[in-house]
Amino acid sequence: MYLIGEALVGDGAELAHIDLIMGNKEGAVGQAFANSISQLSKGHTPLLAVVRPNLPTKPSTLIIPKVTLKKEYQVNQMFGPVQAAVAKAVADSIEEGVFEGVDIEDTVIMASVFVHPTAQDYNKIYRFNYGAMKLALRRALDRFPDVETLLHEKDRAAHAVMGFKVQRLWDPPYLQVAMDLVDRNHMNRVLDELPQNDHLIIEAGTPLIKKFGLSIISEIRERRPNAFIVADLKTLDTGNLEARMTADAGADAVVISGLAPISTIEKAIEDTRKTGIYTVIDMLNVKDPVAVVKQLKVKPDVVELHRGIDVEDTAYAWGDIPAIKKAGGERLLVATAGGIRQGVVKDARKAGADILVVGRAITASKNIQHAAEEFLEELSTEEIDQFRIMTDF
């Protein structure tokens, strides 16, 4: 047996985080248990979990401090409320039947425990660590999470300590606001007035990047830390280099021109895979987007069907979106761009578009928030998990 459990409970300085492994005494966990208790480390000395002095819990449990214990008060916290909480959680779990079918005498547990150096409240330290230990134990024995739960939750997740959410494009449709601007004050106004919405993407347009460079991404990120940000470089050469530059700047996606050589596009895609950002292929002036996608050995994340600003008086034509999706695979998203107005939103959606790219209809509006909200309403989107009350799950 080799089981792994994890849990985070509480908030503030007393927040508790438990990582544990559980296994047989004769196995890898038992060996690690013996090594830890016999090979002490300064500031991280492991201690047996005891309900009170002279009453260790079963299964035998070793507590390992994650944070270096430098001060006397930290040692007192670890040998006081933390030790009692972990031991009581294990003992109560036996009483509650959590260990049903487990040989208690042949099992050992190692629990790595986090206590922040500024934690003070003994009551909270005890209660949070008690809850975290019980939850981590149950999760380990339940083999939590299963793969289905992991895949369902991974893009909904916001790390409690990190403080911001990294957006991914898993729940179309989306509204992408293209900031084809050359004025920083105008950009800031747009960023401040756009609504906070899970289905809104922010694009640093080509003119904006040409005027201020990729460093403008950091300014956008400062104002909209949770946004999905696209850098519209329209790359024609050095695809891997410009993809890496975009990732380093903090953007979530880079736009490569569909007119670029196939090798350039493929190198860009390969580098975005390495850095964890999206590749958008802009098909502006590309006669046969389907053929381009078919030629690619590695497929992009998004294909953008794009009419240029200079030809926006021509009729709307989205091309064969189903054929593009077939060529690009089931995960491919298709965006439509160029003079998008509210009156064509539903037509674009019916044609199969996942992302609608809107520029001046929003950025040049006197009421930017209202204009964006009207487009979002046309898309009939709902905030992700808006009505979900989150605890741990």
From Swiss-Prot:
Chain spans, region Formaldehyde-activating enzyme: 1-161
Entry's Gene Ontology BP terms: 'de novo' pyrimidine nucleobase biosynthetic process; carbohydrate biosynthetic process; L-ascorbic acid catabolic process
Listed GO MF terms: 3-dehydro-L-gulonate-6-phosphate decarboxylase activity; carbon-nitrogen lyase activity; hexulose-6-phosphate synthase activity; hydro-lyase activity; orotidine-5'-phosphate decarboxylase activity
InterPro entries for the chain: Aldolase_TIM, Fae/Hps, HCHO-activating_enzyme, HCHO-activating_enzyme_sf, HPS/KGPDC, OMPdeCOase_dom, Ribosomal_Su5_D2-typ_SF, RibuloseP-bd_barrel
Catalysed reactions listed for this entry: 5,6,7,8-tetrahydromethanopterin + formaldehyde = 5,10-methylenetetrahydromethanopterin + H2O; D-ribulose 5-phosphate + formaldehyde = D-arabino-hex-3-ulose 6-phosphate
Region described as 3-hexulose-6-phosphate synthase: 162-393
Active-site residue list: H17
Protein's pathway: Carbohydrate biosynthesis; D-ribose 5-phosphate biosynthesis
SMART domains the UniProt entry points to: OMPdecase
Binding site for substrate: D19, L48, K66, T68, Q83
Record-listed E.C. numbers: 4.2.1.147, 4.1.2.43
Keyword Lyase included in the entry's annotation: yes
Pfam family, one: Fae
CDD domains linked to this entry: KGPDC_HPS (cd04726)
Gene3D superfamilies (UniProt xref): Aldolase class I (3.20.20.70), Formaldehyde-activating enzyme (3.30.230.60)
Keyword terms, alphabetized: Carbohydrate metabolism, Lyase, Multifunctional enzyme
Superkingdom to which the source organism belongs: Archaea
Annotated function: Catalyzes the condensation of formaldehyde with tetrahydromethanopterin (H(4)MPT) to 5,10-methylenetetrahydromethanopterin. Catalyzes the reversible formation of ribulose-5-phosphate and formaldehyde from 3-hexulose-6-phosphate.
NCBIfam families (UniProt xref): one_C_fae, PRK13307.1
Family note: In the N-terminal section; belongs to the formaldehyde-activating enzyme family.
Protein name: Bifunctional enzyme Fae/Hps
Originating species: Methanoculleus marisnigri (strain ATCC 35101 / DSM 1498 / JR1)
